[in-house]
């Protein structure tokens, strides 16, 4: 009995510390998830401001508001910040908040490493953004940083860019290890692998992808560093190297990377469609199998980014075939989402609107991707605005809509307050219209031959560029409404129930709203 009394002080739930130290020292998965989400939103706004500069320059032909050198810095930083600062930290934040609650774990497996993996990120982006103020300007070679533009002809700030990418990679690897260890070791009794929520499955697979490909990116930028400062010739033909080697290494990282940015979105959308259809998700095991297939296939398609570089014909045929194969598991997922909605009791709250838009617009992005997979056609499409339209249709209504859907869906559980449904729907429709007005016309100007990454263009492309820019400003400014909605919700509002949504299933809906600082200190029993 005495042992129980001695340890009694351990039974109290310790709430968060007061003030700034709560956030600096926190090892709580909910606090770290919140930090990731706010950080990602800040980066989303910075990357978005850069996109606004790009679209303002392209509003009319001719040189308008920025120098060509600065334009190139904008397209480089916009891509890097949106991918490594906007989308990825948002999904890691959602993983931190939700994965432990969904599997009945008290926290992440490695809480101190969790803190470290977040707090090195602001430094990485401070270093990256500080390059704007250096002599020679920021990196200007595009987010894919192809050598020799990023080595022989790079501005001096490239060294800071390399260091920044290393820090981001370290953060991603630590976060991914944490997710894998948590999911493999900390599931509550009864939560078998095939009973895990799909968001948890999608993150388990994503984490393995991160662990596999982040070291490849680190290798690529290290070889760049050696070429720039230490006299090697990895990518310098004059010294026996090969610039195409860089492209192979980069895209071996880069293609799994784009799946890292979409697999968690698949998990989120599966949950939301299931909830608002008020029926069980159609084809759970095939959804898991499709996620696994996509992850495996993502490693054997990288050279479809390089069809015009002079690959052997046999390689072009293989990569075309492998890329088209990607459509099969993706089609399975889209079919299952539609089948889940079929004859369901549908209601269209804001999360569901974003999820349905995701399914429709992601499919459009997938179809244009199938066109790009065809080698002879890609010789025409490559490096035109058709490619820009394709990947933005997958990333904006894909990854970003799913993140917004997730925030609307889970914020009542996080904050106990319901968001303003009318404002949420207004935000959805502004975003939906903005995205389509921005990126749909880019298919047309791309097919007509307008190349990417130029601040000026021929007169024939003027009309659609103006339309695209108007859509971009509509989409960009409507995100300020999203910021307002989130702050308003956190500050107060109609109180949510514990379940929040009729039809919501899963362990996270069994805890109180707002989710207590410590959940599942005793593991729940799952049938």
Walk through the language-model features, giving the residues of each.
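Membrane-embedded and interfacial regions of multi-pass energy-transducing membrane proteins
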Residues: 2-527
């Amino acid at each position: 009995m005495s042992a129980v009394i001695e340890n009694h002080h351990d039974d109290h739930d310790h709430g968060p510390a007061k003030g700034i130290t709560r956030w600096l020292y926190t090892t709580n998965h909910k606090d770290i998830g919140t930090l990731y989400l706010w950080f990602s939103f800040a980066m989303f706004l910075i990357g978005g401001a850069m996109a606004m500069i790009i679209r303002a320059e392209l509003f009319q032909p001719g040189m308008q508001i920025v120098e060509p050198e600065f334009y190139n810095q904008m397209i480089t930083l916009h891509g890097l910040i949106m991918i490594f600062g906007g989308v990825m930290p948002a999904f890691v934040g959602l993983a931190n908040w939700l994965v432990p609650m969904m599997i009945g774990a008290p926290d992440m497996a490695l809480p101190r490493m969790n803190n470290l993996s977040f707090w090195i990120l602001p430094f990485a982006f401070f270093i990256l953004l500080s390059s704007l103020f250096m002599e020679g300007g920021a990196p200007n070679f595009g987010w894919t940083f192809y050598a020799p533009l990023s080595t022989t002809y790079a501005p001096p700030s490239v060294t800071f860019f390399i260091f920044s990418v290393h820090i981001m990679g370290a953060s991603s690897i630590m976060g991914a290890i944490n997710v894998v260890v948590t999911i493999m070791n900390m599931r509550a009794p009864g939560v078998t692998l095939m009973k895990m929520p799909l968001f948890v499955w999608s993150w388990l697979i994503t984490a393995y992808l991160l662990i596999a490909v982040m070291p490849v990116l680190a290798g690529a930028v290290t070889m760049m560093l050696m070429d720039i400062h230490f006299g090697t010739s990895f990518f310098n033909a004059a010294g026996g190297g090969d610039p195409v080697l860089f492209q192979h290494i980069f895209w071996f990282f880069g293609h799994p990377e784009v799946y890292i940015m979409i697999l968690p979105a698949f998990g989120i959308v599966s949950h939301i469609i299931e909830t608002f259809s008020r029926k069980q998700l159609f084809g759970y095991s095939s959804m898991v199998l499709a996620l696994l297939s996509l992850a495996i296939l993502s490693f054997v398609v990288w050279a479809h980014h390089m069809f015009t570089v002079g690959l052997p014909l046999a390689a072009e045929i293989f990569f075309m075939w492998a890329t088209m194969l990607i459509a099969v598991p993706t089609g399975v997922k889209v079919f299952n989402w539609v089948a889940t909605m079929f004859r369901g009791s549908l209601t269209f709250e804001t999360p569901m609107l974003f999820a349905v838009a995701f399914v429709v617009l992601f499919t459009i992005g997938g179809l244009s991707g199938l066109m790009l997979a065809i080698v002879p056609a890609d010789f025409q499409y490559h490096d035109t605005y058709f490619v820009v339209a394709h990947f933005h249709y997958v990333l904006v209504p894909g990854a970003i809509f799913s993140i917004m859907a997730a925030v609307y869906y889970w914020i009542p559980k996080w904050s106990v307050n319901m968001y303003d449904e009318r404002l949420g729907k207004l935000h959805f429709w502004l975003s939906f219209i903005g995205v389509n007005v921005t990126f749909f016309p880019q298919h047309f100007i791309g097919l007509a031959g307008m190349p990417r990454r130029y601040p000026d263009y021929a007169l024939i492309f003027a009309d659609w560029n103006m339309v695209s820019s108007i859509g971009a400003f509509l989409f960009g400014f409507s995100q300020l409404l999203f910021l307002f909605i989130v702050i308003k919700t956190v500050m107060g509002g109609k109180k949510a129930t514990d379940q929040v949504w009729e039809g919501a299933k899963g362990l996270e809906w069994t805890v109180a709203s707002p989710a207590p600082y410590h959940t599942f200190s005793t593991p729940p029993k799952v049938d």
